[in-house]
A protein has these predicted regions:
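Short functional hotspots at interaction and active-site rims
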Residues: 1-274
Length: 274
């Protein structure tokens, strides 16, 4: 310490003389190839592979730091394996090829999702060693179906049905809620489901001057309203409404927060011009 004080005028530690080289640097390409062929390996599994296959002992933090420095993050989006079936793949390719020619202001994407009076966030925080317990209804709750359309500039024709969706309920929605909002030349896209094909649905849409097209099977990624539902359900879990009336009011409030720019972003993300 006396020598440091004499030399620098300070008793602080001397600055480092250089940057230590990571032992993973020599295995860089191997690490890239590993996650390219097995992308869902955990840090612990990669660490174990290094030890067995490369005789290299490192900590999981070192493995994380290596991939983080090379902008390789841990993530995964799940798509239906059925998308690889020849008939489904052909239908998806045809729909994607058509996307650029569609006029976004004329498009209306319809879908429905279930909502309940027992929705709650699935995770939270508490001290280590303690359990985080949340109370939700287990014996009595209500399940409803929220159905709506998405246009380039906002939500349209929102409606809540008591219980699950069936053919007669969907037909009533189309005739009484959706059809009055349609204009000449509109194209209504919806999932290729039996309940969406009951007698009267296509006729009601056609009578309003619009046409109906069904999305390819196993293709939620081609329906931009799916992203709205993800946001909606996250907000519903946050507020955790416990009565039917409170849930209705909350859905109505959340619909108003979906801005036009946000809708356009959803269209673009699904591959449509906006």
């Amino acid at each position: 310490m006396d020598q440091t004080l004499d030399a620098t005028g300070s008793i602080g530690a001397l600055p480092g003389t250089g940057h230590s080289r990571s032992p993973l640097k020599a295995r860089e390409q191997w690490l890239f190839d590993l996650v390219a062929t097995e992308p869902d390996l955990t840090l612990a599994e990669i660490r174990a592979r290094l030890r067995v296959e490369k005789k290299l002992k490192v900590g999981t933090t070192s493995v994380w730091r290596f991939y983080n420095c090379h902008e390789t993050t841990f993530k995964k989006t799940l798509h239906a394996a059925e998308q690889d079936r020849p008939d489904v793949a052909a239908a998806r390719a045809a729909r994607k090829a058509e996307q650029a020619s569609l006029k976004a202001p004329r498009l209306v994407f319809i879908d429905e999702t279930s909502v309940t009076t027992k929705m709650v966030r699935h995770y939270g925080r508490c001290p280590v060693g303690e359990r985080l317990v949340a109370k939700v209804p287990h014996g009595h709750w209500k399940t409803m179906t929220f159905i709506a359309g998405l246009r380039i500039d906002g939500m349209t024709a929102p409606y809540v049905i008591d219980g699950s969706m069936d053919g007669p309920s969907f037909l009533a929605y189309v005739e009484q809620v959706l059809a009055p909002t349609l204009h000449d030349g509109d194209i209504v896209f919806m999932d290729n489901l039996r309940t969406h094909k009951v007698d009267g649905v296509a006729a009601a849409i056609k009578a309003a001057g619009a046409s109906v097209r069904y999305l390819p099977a196993y293709s939620p990624d081609l329906n931009p309203i799916e992203m709205v539902f993800v946001k909606l359900k996250a907000a519903l879990r946050k507020d955790a409404a416990r009565t039917v009336e409170a849930l209705w009011k909350l859905i109505g409030k959340l619909i108003k927060t979906i801005a036009p720019d946000e809708c356009a972003n959803y269209f673009r993300h699904a591959g449509y011009k906006a």
